[in-house]
Amino acid sequence: MVLRIVASLLSIAALVLMAKDKQVVYLNLAGEELTLEAKHSYVEAFVYLVYSNGLVAIYCFLLVFALVFRLIDKAGCGKSAAWIIFLLDQGLAYVLLAAAAASTEVAYVAKRGNNKVGWSEVCSTFGHFCNLVGVSIVITFISVLAMATLSVMSARRLFKTYGPERKQISSNDAPAI
């Protein structure tokens, strides 16, 4: 349960950093004042990152809520609930990984540019924006690790529901040696 809270908090932190990240730059080109603005909503990959982090944060929060108030019995989780949790953990881990990877590519192009297609880098102009984007992406990758760990844990819990029945062996049932 603690790891779900950590994943939720990490996703919220990454979401807030990216959603609030904005920078306005004023340039003087040939005597003309030019205003340039950078914010996450201008880049689809960053919008995807914000929504993915929000989805993970809400899911983890709702599952923690359900576990705390025993809406889902943690110890005696039935097969259907174990399957649902496993599939959602897996799916959201992959969604978050895809969002982080897409955002990393966009951030890389913003930082380095791409000479083959004539795209220049923009982080020298929007340094503060690029730095916060980088921090948000790093936090998202940490959240991906938390979700991947949760996926392994939920898979283990699921596979235990298909394990052999364990019965207690009394001293009378022990085989003679």
Curated annotation (Swiss-Prot):
Membrane topology, as annotated: Multi-pass membrane protein
Subcellular location(s) per record: Cell membrane
Assigned GO CC terms: plasma membrane
Spans traversing the lipid bilayer: 1-21, 49-69, 81-101, 132-152
This protein's record includes keyword Kinase: no
Domain of life of the source: Eukaryota
PANTHER family, per database record: CASP-LIKE PROTEIN 2C1-RELATED, CASP-LIKE PROTEIN 4A4
NCBIfam families: A_tha_TIGR01569 (TIGR01569)
Record's protein name: CASP-like protein 2U1
Protein species of origin: Osmunda lancea
Organism placement in taxonomy: Eukaryota, Viridiplantae, Streptophyta, Embryophyta, Tracheophyta
